[in-house]
């Protein structure tokens, strides 16, 4: 094993001949470099995806479209991202993790700039579809890289830090676009986001250490189908895939339509104020790492259902017409979501024993499919029954998620060191 790792410049000790290569542990330089690089990747992924969310009411006016149609600017991206995950995960199993991560983020940045230059709504949607497809290479591979390289005892923390990057990216993307769109055109805002993503891609290339535990798998269709079938035979993985759909579907639905609610009576918030609500993501940054660490300590099965219950409580508070209660509800909901996603993500990596890239891909396929389907379906509930309809829809998704989490808590864990409790 070389003492340097390609363009990343990360160093590692050279093991004795025949000695096993150790996993990366907390407190080492390699852990810090990995955390920084994937934090940047997670940041850019969510910033590029969700910077369009605060613009949706404005896009409705600019293009003469309704809320459900406007939501396509996000739903189409998450749909192509979901489909892309079924391709990019297996590609990374064949050619390596870092290469796929860096090229994917660079492509997403270029397509985001392309969306800013598109002359029509259809052109914007086409570019956004390509953004989602490119980001699939970051979304699946980052989780797999961590599962392979980080010591199992520190995987929950590392996954939490990565998802914290997602949270900060989602917050920053919404915050920047929500505020700037009052002063700049939406074209300019998207161009700016593309430039920031280019910087994140450079960070990822420079700091992410090359894999030490990656073993190439030939890219064969039969092997892919066998890998997917293998994961669905596991007693826990299919339920975790379903959780991705339910959790992300509820989360995106809330943030897609809360802007429409808060612009209208009795709140009358400005576009800038709605953009500033992205600071609620700070709770997700804290919860993703802390809940992940708690799951490492007390067990995922004991923590998972609690954070989902917290999301339900948050949705209930948003049904009131008092702004402080709505904001508190959004805070609890966001805290619970990122905590739950952190637990589920690390659980996938610990439970999948083979073809981990495909396991991550299946989880995130369900995750972003939930975003795409539920995120647009929520618009139907909004037009039919206002926020009460949206709240009922979200609560229904979360009640199913809670039942699934309680079922997972009763599953017999795999023997150590194969899976976490």
Describe the role of every protein-language-model region.
Residues 21-28, 209-241:
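Juxtamembrane intracellular "pre-TM" segments in multi-pass secondary transporters
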Residues 99-113, 302-316, 395:
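Structural signature of the two symmetry-related core transmembrane helices
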Residues 107, 111-114, 122-130, 324-332:
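Paired small-residue
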């Amino acid at each position: 094993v070389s003492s340097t790792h390609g363009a990343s410049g990360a160093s590692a000790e050279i093991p004795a001949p025949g000695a096993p290569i150790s996993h990366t542990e907390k407190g080492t330089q390699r852990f810090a470099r990995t955390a920084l690089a994937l934090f940047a990747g997670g940041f850019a992924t969510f910033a590029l995806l969700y910077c369009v969310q605060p613009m949706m009411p404005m896009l409705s006016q600019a293009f003469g479209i309704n809320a459900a149609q406007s939501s396509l600017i996000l739903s189409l991206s998450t749909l192509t991202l979901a489909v892309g995950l079924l391709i990019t995960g297996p590609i990374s199993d064949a050619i390596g993790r870092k290469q796929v991560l860096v090229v994917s983020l660079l492509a997403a940045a270029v397509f985001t700039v392309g969306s800013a230059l598109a002359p029509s709504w259809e052109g914007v949607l086409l570019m956004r579809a390509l953004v989602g497809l490119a980001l699939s290479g970051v979304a699946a591979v980052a989780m797999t890289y961590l599962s392979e390289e980080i010591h199992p005892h520190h995987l929950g923390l590392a996954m939490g830090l990565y998802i914290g990057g997602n949270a900060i990216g989602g917050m920053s993307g919404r915050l920047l676009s929500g505020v700037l769109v009052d002063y700049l055109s939406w074209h300019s805002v998207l161009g700016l986001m593309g430039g920031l993503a280019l910087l994140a891609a450079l960070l990822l290339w420079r700091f992410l250490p090359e894999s030490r535990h990656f073993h190439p798998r030939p890219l064969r269709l039969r092997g892919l189908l066998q890998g997917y079938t293998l994961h669905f035979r596991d007693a826990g993985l299919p339920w975790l895939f379903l959780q991705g759909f339910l959790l992300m579907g509820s989360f995106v639905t809330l943030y897609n339509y809360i802007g429409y609610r808060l612009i209208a009576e009795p709140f009358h918030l400005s576009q800038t104020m709605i953009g500033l609500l992205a600071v609620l993501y700070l709770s997700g940054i804290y919860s993703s790492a802390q809940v992940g660490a708690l799951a490492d300590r007390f067990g995922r099965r004991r923590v998972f259902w609690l954070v989902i219950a917290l999301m339900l409580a948050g949705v209930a508070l948003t049904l009131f017409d008092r702004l402080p209660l709505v904001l508190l509800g959004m805070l609890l909901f966001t805290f619970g979501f990122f905590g739950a996603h952190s637990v589920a993500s690390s659980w996938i990596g610990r439970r999948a024993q083979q073809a981990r890239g495909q396991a991550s891909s299946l989880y995130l396929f369900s995750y972003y499919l939930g975003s795409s389907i539920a995120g647009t379906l929520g618009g139907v509930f909004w037009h039919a029954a206002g926020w009460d309809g949206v709240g009922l829809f979200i609560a229904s998704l979360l009640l199913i998620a809670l039942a699934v989490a309680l079922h997972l808590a009763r599953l017999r864990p795999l023997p150590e060191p194969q899976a976490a409790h």
